Amino acid sequence: MGVKQIFMSFALLATLYQADAQEKTVMLKYGDMNSWVTRTIHESAIIGGNDKTLYEVGPNKHLDGNHAYRNLGGSPWGTSNVMAKVSGITKTNNCVYKEKRGNGYCARLETHIERVKVLGLVNINVLAAGSLFLGDMTEPITGTKNGEKYQNCGVPFTSRPKALRFDYKFKSSGEPDRIKLTGFGGSSVVKGKDKAVVMLLLQKRHEDAKGNITAKRVGTMVVTYDKSTKEWINGMTCKILYGDIRKSPEYVEETMKLRTIDYARNSKGVNVPVKETGWASDNETPTHMVLQFLSSHGGAYIGSPGNTLWVDNVKLVY
Protein backbone atom coordinates (compact mmCIF):
# COMPACT_ATOMS: atom_id res chain seq x y z
CA MET A 1 0.00 0.00 0.00
CA GLY A 2 1.42 3.38 -1.02
CA VAL A 3 1.72 6.48 1.13
CA LYS A 4 -1.32 8.05 -0.56
CA GLN A 5 -3.50 4.99 0.11
CA ILE A 6 -2.38 4.85 3.75
CA PHE A 7 -3.17 8.55 4.20
CA MET A 8 -6.62 8.12 2.63
CA SER A 9 -7.35 5.15 4.89
CA PHE A 10 -6.47 7.15 7.99
CA ALA A 11 -8.57 10.07 6.73
CA LEU A 12 -11.56 7.78 6.22
CA LEU A 13 -11.18 6.28 9.68
CA ALA A 14 -10.94 9.76 11.19
CA THR A 15 -14.09 10.84 9.35
CA LEU A 16 -16.00 7.77 10.55
CA TYR A 17 -14.80 8.32 14.10
CA GLN A 18 -15.83 11.97 13.99
CA ALA A 19 -19.30 11.10 12.67
CA ASP A 20 -19.75 8.48 15.36
CA ALA A 21 -18.52 10.87 18.05
CA GLN A 22 -21.06 13.47 16.91
CA GLU A 23 -23.95 11.04 17.29
CA LYS A 24 -25.95 11.55 20.46
CA THR A 25 -28.38 9.04 21.94
CA VAL A 26 -30.98 9.79 24.59
CA MET A 27 -32.71 7.00 26.50
CA LEU A 28 -36.42 7.65 26.91
CA LYS A 29 -37.47 7.88 30.56
CA TYR A 30 -37.87 4.32 31.89
CA GLY A 31 -36.87 3.19 28.39
CA ASP A 32 -34.40 0.68 29.84
CA MET A 33 -37.46 -1.29 31.04
CA ASN A 34 -35.78 -2.03 34.37
CA SER A 35 -38.41 -0.38 36.55
CA TRP A 36 -42.05 -1.49 36.79
CA VAL A 37 -45.25 -0.79 38.69
CA THR A 38 -47.03 -4.02 39.68
CA ARG A 39 -50.79 -3.86 40.28
CA THR A 40 -52.97 -6.46 41.99
CA ILE A 41 -56.62 -6.31 40.88
CA HIS A 42 -59.44 -8.43 42.32
CA GLU A 43 -61.86 -9.51 39.60
CA SER A 44 -65.58 -9.86 40.28
CA ALA A 45 -66.91 -13.07 41.82
CA ILE A 46 -69.30 -13.63 38.92
CA ILE A 47 -66.29 -14.32 36.66
CA GLY A 48 -64.26 -16.26 39.20
CA GLY A 49 -63.11 -13.69 41.75
CA ASN A 50 -59.41 -14.16 40.99
CA ASP A 51 -56.57 -11.80 41.86
CA LYS A 52 -54.81 -10.67 38.68
CA THR A 53 -51.46 -8.93 38.19
CA LEU A 54 -51.05 -6.02 35.78
CA TYR A 55 -47.69 -4.46 34.84
CA GLU A 56 -46.95 -0.82 33.99
CA VAL A 57 -43.64 0.79 33.05
CA GLY A 58 -42.75 3.22 35.82
CA PRO A 59 -41.13 3.43 39.26
CA ASN A 60 -40.66 0.19 41.22
CA LYS A 61 -43.88 0.06 43.21
CA HIS A 62 -46.71 -2.31 44.12
CA LEU A 63 -50.33 -1.16 44.08
CA ASP A 64 -53.05 -3.29 45.67
CA GLY A 65 -56.71 -2.60 44.97
CA ASN A 66 -59.20 -1.91 42.21
CA HIS A 67 -58.17 1.68 41.59
CA ALA A 68 -57.91 3.47 38.25
CA TYR A 69 -54.26 3.74 37.24
CA ARG A 70 -52.54 7.00 36.35
CA ASN A 71 -48.92 7.04 35.19
CA LEU A 72 -46.56 7.29 38.16
CA GLY A 73 -43.11 8.80 38.62
CA GLY A 74 -43.31 10.90 35.47
CA SER A 75 -43.45 7.77 33.32
CA PRO A 76 -44.44 8.56 29.72
CA TRP A 77 -45.42 4.94 29.02
CA GLY A 78 -48.86 3.43 28.70
CA THR A 79 -49.76 -0.20 28.01
CA SER A 80 -52.72 -2.26 26.88
CA ASN A 81 -52.85 -3.71 30.41
CA VAL A 82 -56.14 -2.41 31.76
CA MET A 83 -58.84 -2.75 34.37
CA ALA A 84 -62.40 -2.66 33.03
CA LYS A 85 -65.68 -2.18 34.88
CA VAL A 86 -68.58 -3.05 32.59
CA SER A 87 -72.11 -3.42 34.00
CA GLY A 88 -70.64 -3.59 37.50
CA ILE A 89 -68.23 -6.41 36.65
CA THR A 90 -64.49 -5.85 37.20
CA LYS A 91 -62.24 -7.60 34.67
CA THR A 92 -58.58 -7.21 33.70
CA ASN A 93 -56.46 -7.78 30.64
CA ASN A 94 -52.66 -8.14 30.68
CA CYS A 95 -50.70 -8.46 27.42
CA VAL A 96 -47.49 -6.63 28.39
CA TYR A 97 -45.20 -8.37 30.86
CA LYS A 98 -42.10 -7.59 32.87
CA GLU A 99 -39.51 -10.20 31.92
CA LYS A 100 -35.98 -10.84 33.17
CA ARG A 101 -33.19 -10.07 30.72
CA GLY A 102 -29.57 -10.38 31.84
CA ASN A 103 -29.08 -8.23 34.93
CA GLY A 104 -32.21 -6.20 34.23
CA TYR A 105 -35.61 -6.49 32.63
CA CYS A 106 -37.36 -6.02 29.30
CA ALA A 107 -40.97 -5.77 28.10
CA ARG A 108 -42.72 -8.76 26.54
CA LEU A 109 -45.77 -8.01 24.40
CA GLU A 110 -48.08 -10.92 23.59
CA THR A 111 -51.14 -11.51 21.45
CA HIS A 112 -53.52 -13.90 23.17
CA ILE A 113 -57.16 -14.83 23.60
CA GLU A 114 -58.64 -13.44 26.80
CA ARG A 115 -61.20 -15.95 28.06
CA VAL A 116 -64.04 -15.06 30.42
CA LYS A 117 -66.49 -17.52 31.96
CA VAL A 118 -69.58 -15.96 33.56
CA LEU A 119 -71.09 -17.99 36.43
CA GLY A 120 -69.05 -20.90 35.17
CA LEU A 121 -71.33 -21.26 32.15
CA VAL A 122 -71.09 -18.54 29.49
CA ASN A 123 -67.79 -18.28 27.64
CA ILE A 124 -66.71 -14.93 26.17
CA ASN A 125 -63.47 -15.00 24.17
CA VAL A 126 -61.71 -11.85 22.94
CA LEU A 127 -58.43 -11.47 21.06
CA ALA A 128 -56.08 -8.97 22.72
CA ALA A 129 -52.71 -7.72 21.48
CA GLY A 130 -49.83 -6.30 23.49
CA SER A 131 -49.24 -2.56 23.12
CA LEU A 132 -46.54 -0.40 24.70
CA PHE A 133 -46.83 3.29 23.82
CA LEU A 134 -46.07 6.85 24.84
CA GLY A 135 -49.17 8.20 26.55
CA ASP A 136 -51.63 6.67 29.00
CA MET A 137 -54.93 4.82 29.34
CA THR A 138 -58.11 6.22 30.86
CA GLU A 139 -59.34 3.70 33.43
CA PRO A 140 -61.61 2.03 34.11
CA ILE A 141 -62.66 0.86 30.66
CA THR A 142 -66.46 1.02 30.73
CA GLY A 143 -67.47 -0.44 27.36
CA THR A 144 -66.49 -2.95 24.73
CA LYS A 145 -66.82 -0.69 21.68
CA ASN A 146 -64.30 1.80 20.31
CA GLY A 147 -61.53 0.88 22.72
CA GLU A 148 -59.17 3.39 21.09
CA LYS A 149 -61.01 6.29 22.76
CA TYR A 150 -59.61 5.26 26.15
CA GLN A 151 -56.04 5.72 24.90
CA ASN A 152 -54.30 9.08 25.19
CA CYS A 153 -51.80 8.64 22.37
CA GLY A 154 -48.62 10.70 22.24
CA VAL A 155 -46.65 13.07 24.48
CA PRO A 156 -45.48 16.69 24.06
CA PHE A 157 -42.21 16.73 22.13
CA THR A 158 -40.37 19.47 20.21
CA SER A 159 -37.10 17.89 19.02
CA ARG A 160 -36.09 16.44 15.64
CA PRO A 161 -34.21 13.15 16.20
CA LYS A 162 -32.59 11.27 13.31
CA ALA A 163 -33.71 7.81 14.33
CA LEU A 164 -35.24 5.49 16.91
CA ARG A 165 -32.97 2.83 18.43
CA PHE A 166 -34.07 -0.19 20.46
CA ASP A 167 -33.33 -3.85 21.20
CA TYR A 168 -35.92 -6.38 20.13
CA LYS A 169 -36.74 -10.04 19.70
CA PHE A 170 -39.75 -11.44 17.84
CA LYS A 171 -41.59 -14.75 17.75
CA SER A 172 -44.17 -15.26 15.02
CA SER A 173 -47.25 -17.40 15.61
CA GLY A 174 -46.48 -19.10 12.29
CA GLU A 175 -50.09 -18.84 11.13
CA PRO A 176 -50.65 -17.76 7.48
CA ASP A 177 -53.68 -15.61 8.41
CA ARG A 178 -55.01 -13.67 11.37
CA ILE A 179 -58.31 -13.98 13.20
CA LYS A 180 -60.85 -11.46 14.44
CA LEU A 181 -62.45 -12.35 17.76
CA THR A 182 -64.63 -9.70 19.41
CA GLY A 183 -66.38 -11.74 22.10
CA PHE A 184 -69.63 -11.73 20.16
CA GLY A 185 -70.03 -14.80 17.96
CA GLY A 186 -67.18 -16.93 16.72
CA SER A 187 -63.87 -15.96 15.16
CA SER A 188 -63.48 -14.91 11.54
CA VAL A 189 -60.42 -15.13 9.29
CA VAL A 190 -58.53 -11.96 8.35
CA LYS A 191 -56.28 -12.63 5.38
CA GLY A 192 -52.58 -11.94 5.73
CA LYS A 193 -49.84 -13.00 8.12
CA ASP A 194 -49.67 -11.18 11.43
CA LYS A 195 -46.85 -8.70 12.05
CA ALA A 196 -45.40 -6.86 14.99
CA VAL A 197 -45.27 -3.09 14.44
CA VAL A 198 -42.99 -0.33 15.71
CA MET A 199 -44.29 3.14 14.84
CA LEU A 200 -42.92 6.61 15.62
CA LEU A 201 -44.77 9.69 14.36
CA LEU A 202 -43.89 13.32 14.95
CA GLN A 203 -46.89 15.63 14.70
CA LYS A 204 -47.61 19.33 14.83
CA ARG A 205 -50.98 19.43 16.56
CA HIS A 206 -53.62 22.15 16.72
CA GLU A 207 -56.65 22.30 19.01
CA ASP A 208 -59.60 24.50 18.07
CA ALA A 209 -61.98 26.31 20.42
CA LYS A 210 -64.27 23.26 20.57
CA GLY A 211 -61.45 20.95 21.64
CA ASN A 212 -61.05 19.16 18.30
CA ILE A 213 -57.47 18.13 17.49
CA THR A 214 -55.92 18.12 14.03
CA ALA A 215 -52.29 17.47 13.15
CA LYS A 216 -49.76 17.83 10.36
CA ARG A 217 -47.34 14.90 9.99
CA VAL A 218 -43.78 16.10 10.61
CA GLY A 219 -41.82 12.82 10.90
CA THR A 220 -42.54 9.17 10.12
CA MET A 221 -40.94 5.85 11.04
CA VAL A 222 -42.77 2.52 10.76
CA VAL A 223 -41.23 -0.96 10.68
CA THR A 224 -42.95 -4.35 10.78
CA TYR A 225 -41.69 -7.82 11.67
CA ASP A 226 -43.22 -11.11 10.51
CA LYS A 227 -40.24 -13.48 10.78
CA SER A 228 -39.05 -14.88 14.09
CA THR A 229 -35.58 -13.94 15.31
CA LYS A 230 -33.39 -16.59 16.89
CA GLU A 231 -31.98 -14.15 19.42
CA TRP A 232 -32.05 -10.50 20.47
CA ILE A 233 -31.32 -7.86 17.83
CA ASN A 234 -29.51 -5.14 19.77
CA GLY A 235 -29.31 -1.51 18.73
CA MET A 236 -31.85 -1.71 15.91
CA THR A 237 -31.73 1.78 14.38
CA CYS A 238 -34.68 3.02 12.30
CA LYS A 239 -34.41 6.30 10.40
CA ILE A 240 -37.11 8.95 10.81
CA LEU A 241 -38.30 10.45 7.50
CA TYR A 242 -39.31 14.12 7.55
CA GLY A 243 -41.90 16.04 5.56
CA ASP A 244 -44.08 14.67 2.76
CA ILE A 245 -42.59 11.22 2.14
CA ARG A 246 -45.13 9.87 -0.35
CA LYS A 247 -42.57 9.92 -3.18
CA SER A 248 -39.81 8.38 -1.07
CA PRO A 249 -38.77 4.82 -2.00
CA GLU A 250 -39.10 4.00 1.71
CA TYR A 251 -42.78 5.01 1.81
CA VAL A 252 -45.28 2.20 2.46
CA GLU A 253 -48.86 3.38 2.00
CA GLU A 254 -50.46 0.75 4.23
CA THR A 255 -48.46 1.62 7.33
CA MET A 256 -47.27 5.20 6.76
CA LYS A 257 -50.35 7.00 5.41
CA LEU A 258 -52.01 9.80 7.39
CA ARG A 259 -54.03 8.52 10.36
CA THR A 260 -57.41 9.42 11.85
CA ILE A 261 -57.91 6.51 14.28
CA ASP A 262 -55.80 7.70 17.23
CA TYR A 263 -57.14 9.59 20.24
CA ALA A 264 -55.54 12.17 22.54
CA ARG A 265 -56.64 14.12 25.60
CA ASN A 266 -57.47 17.73 24.77
CA SER A 267 -57.15 20.80 27.01
CA LYS A 268 -60.65 20.13 28.38
CA GLY A 269 -59.56 16.70 29.64
CA VAL A 270 -61.56 14.81 27.02
CA ASN A 271 -60.12 12.12 24.72
CA VAL A 272 -60.90 13.11 21.13
CA PRO A 273 -59.77 11.80 17.72
CA VAL A 274 -56.51 13.17 16.31
CA LYS A 275 -57.11 13.78 12.62
CA GLU A 276 -53.98 14.13 10.51
CA THR A 277 -54.87 16.58 7.74
CA GLY A 278 -51.64 16.77 5.75
CA TRP A 279 -47.87 16.64 5.62
CA ALA A 280 -45.73 19.33 7.24
CA SER A 281 -42.67 20.82 5.56
CA ASP A 282 -39.48 18.83 6.09
CA ASN A 283 -38.01 21.51 8.38
CA GLU A 284 -41.06 21.85 10.66
CA THR A 285 -40.78 21.47 14.45
CA PRO A 286 -43.22 18.97 16.02
CA THR A 287 -45.37 19.48 19.09
CA HIS A 288 -45.94 15.79 19.90
CA MET A 289 -44.38 12.36 19.48
CA VAL A 290 -46.41 9.18 18.99
CA LEU A 291 -44.50 5.95 19.66
CA GLN A 292 -46.06 2.48 19.73
CA PHE A 293 -44.78 -1.08 19.93
CA LEU A 294 -47.47 -3.62 18.95
CA SER A 295 -47.43 -7.42 18.94
CA SER A 296 -50.05 -7.55 16.14
CA HIS A 297 -51.42 -5.38 13.34
CA GLY A 298 -54.77 -4.75 11.72
CA GLY A 299 -56.76 -3.08 14.48
CA ALA A 300 -58.72 -4.03 17.58
CA TYR A 301 -59.51 -7.73 18.14
CA ILE A 302 -57.35 -8.76 15.14
CA GLY A 303 -54.14 -10.80 15.27
CA SER A 304 -52.62 -14.24 15.70
CA PRO A 305 -52.41 -15.73 19.21
CA GLY A 306 -48.78 -16.44 20.02
CA ASN A 307 -47.26 -13.45 18.25
CA THR A 308 -44.73 -12.08 20.76
CA LEU A 309 -42.49 -8.99 20.67
CA TRP A 310 -39.78 -8.27 23.25
CA VAL A 311 -38.53 -4.66 23.62
CA ASP A 312 -35.70 -3.06 25.58
CA ASN A 313 -33.45 0.04 25.71
CA VAL A 314 -35.58 2.50 23.74
CA LYS A 315 -33.56 5.54 22.66
CA LEU A 316 -33.66 8.49 20.30
CA VAL A 317 -30.67 9.18 18.08
CA TYR A 318 -29.59 12.75 17.25
Predicted features and spans:
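Aromatic (Trp/Tyr/Phe) and Gly/Pro-enriched flexible surface segments
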Residues: 22-159, 191-205, 209-243, 253-297, ...
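Sparse recognition of residues in long alpha-helices and their boundaries
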Residues: 49, 181-182
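A short secondary-structure junction signal
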Residues: 176-181, 211-212
